[in-house]
Amino acid sequence: AREGMLELHLSILHGVAARYRTPFFSALKEYSHRPTGVFHALPISQGKSIVNSHWIRDMVGFYGLDVFMAETSATCGGLDSLLEPTGPLRESQQLAAQAYGSRHTYFVTNGTSTANKIVTQALVAPGDIVLLDRNCHQSHHYGMMLAGANVVYLEAYPLNDYSMYGAVPLREIKSKLLALKRAGKLDRVKMMSLTNCTFDGIVYDVERVMEECLAIKPDLVFLWDEAWFAFARFHPVYRTRTAMASARALRERLQDPDYKRRFEEHLAAETAEEPSDDDLLARRLIPDPARARVRVYATQSTHKTLTALRQGSMIHVFDQDYDQKVAEPFHEAYMAHTSTSPNYQILASLDLGRRQVALEGVELVQRQIENAMQLRDAIDNHPLLSKYMRCLRTSDLIPEGFRPSAISQPLRSGLRNMMAAWDQDEFVLDPSRITLFIGPTGYDGDTFKRQQLMDRYGIQINKTSRNSVLFMTNIGTTRSSVAFLVEVLVNIARELDQDISEMSLGEREHFEQAVYRLTEMSLVLPDFSGFHPAFRDHSGSEATPEGDVRRAFYLSYDDTNCQYLTGEQIDERLDAGVDIVSATYVTPYPPGFPVLVPGQVFSREILQFMRDLDTPEIHGYRPNFGYRVYTEKAIEMVSESIGLTPNGHRPSRRKAAPKTAKKKPAKHGGANGEGNLPEVGHDELIGPNQPGDALAAAPPPADSAVPEVGVEELIGGQQPGDAVQADNSS
């Protein structure tokens, strides 16, 4: 027994020592202690331009000398190059890959905005189709523009009562993929990008999303923006819904001989009847293990939720085809977006942050969750606070249809219920996010944030909506900081209570009107109105919604193509039947996502939303001029260049059939069997061997009511004489 204890002791020490290693930080620290002569760049190196100054010595007093002793541009002498790492920096990235469960990890010193652009440029070529959450960070939109992608925007479910979006339902994703398949464009679909978790804490079932998408498009690449989710790897419940853990689990399942056997048995049991799209959308699909490729990327803002200096981020890769297909393009994209003068302090902090979570991450994240739950309890159980504000529950932010577990408050009903919800529900809520509904205070979210929390008490938050503010606990949150926040909220509520009691009748009426607007009136969030036909792709057997953002973006570089119109002027032109097309991104804060992108047509819903939003910060909108839009002449010019008629359609290429050449109706008609279009074979329509031609669905889990579907139901049996009918409904 003593021998066993000794082996255990030595194993633990070995594991701790391996995790404690910080190759780049240690190399930088050692380098900083060497005497050097700088005959190159960086006068600030070792603080020499500061300590010898008459006027800026206080910089050393504030920051300390060590940070300047470690400031260097050297890439040798024990250090390394971020662009071509071969030494300690390479080792640090390998250790990060082990800690985060990836096959490759890369450090980024300009935030996840740059990380997203690197991954997008590495994977997407001009003309590739990308499925993108419209409610994503602006870096994705700009990345699509730089890559020349044709973007299909995915709609998240709206939360109109709180003027925010949730997440993109799996049904929405599948419907877009199936539409692209029908149009014969599935071979051009390259990537899908989603945000997990969302800013407001809504978490996807990552493995299921990838599983069902790969059943339709077996080589689809996934980019998961985990800017706010880096910490999730280090908690056993959270981890199951991270990109890297889900990629590994899916890969192992696809390689499991039992899975392959069950898949083959299910194929043999399929019928030849082809299911409708509605059937496919309602059923759980699984991929063919012989064809599916697990290709997953995650970008994380380490500095947002873990220990790192600002702008410290990471790219994690789990891609079966990385070495064959992506390594070289990724290197070029990394070179294109990475500075040749990276900040070594940021890189060292990423190394140290990895050490911390590798050794104590589980403890820190558990404490983070506990602090969040204490904050929820303190707010909701305080009689005065609950009068003016409340923490939104899972049932407030995730509609019932996405919660098969039917647990309305899994965060408060015990660990077993929380795990059940995380195992079954399409979306779950991150316990460390607290969305505080403040409508009864009469304050809108932005005013509450600035005038009350930040200006008066120094409470820092970021995300607000029309009637809510978001609090997030992190691994640095302490119990005393939670207690201070509760005290601040109580002070605000107490002052408000007193002010209301002393209001005149007129003031009271004004206050009640403000409360009514914030609590009873909802602000309808507009759907994506669509790209103008001049920027759409018109190939394929039927219309699909993807648009060329890059072409629309660069058209505005010639200012003669643009003009400014006010909302009222746009209304008048819409009344006259004229399409008005945005020349730029229009992004109000809050909510912080582009309401308009280049090439998108204005709608009345968008204009009304912008009028009702009541926010002073709108990027892409100039109050004195209005919206920057394309002139009618510019749109006509682009339309003519791609062969569109004035009404936005391509001229028909069909020749009128001679009157004497009447034919009998084709046997295989449209949806109702009565069409008389000419027959078109499968290979003529979408080409042979299209990805996704062999879809299948697994038998659902025992606790699921989702029916089965397999290959033959999904694409139909290859019966002699079968032909695919062209659809001209669009």
Model-derived regions, located:
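Short acidic-aromatic active-site loops that bind/stabilize oxyanions
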Residues: G78-L89, T105-T109, T195, F199, ...
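Intrinsically disordered, low-complexity tandem-repeat regions
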Residues: H682, A698, A702, V711, ...
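Conserved PLP-enzyme active-site core in the AAT-like
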Residues: A115-A125, I129-D380
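Non-catalytic terminal extensions of PLP-dependent enzymes
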Residues: A1-S81, R90, Q98, A243-E273, ...
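Short loop-beta-helix segment that forms the pyridoxal 5′-phosphate
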Residues: A97-V119
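Conserved positions within tandem-repeat grammars
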Residues: D683-E684, N689, D693, P707, ...
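General small-molecule cofactor/ligand-binding pocket signal
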Residues: Y106, V152-L154, N462
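Short amphipathic alpha-helical segments embedded in low-complexity Lys/Glu-rich regions
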Residues: G111-T114, N160-D161, S193-L194, S468-L470, ...
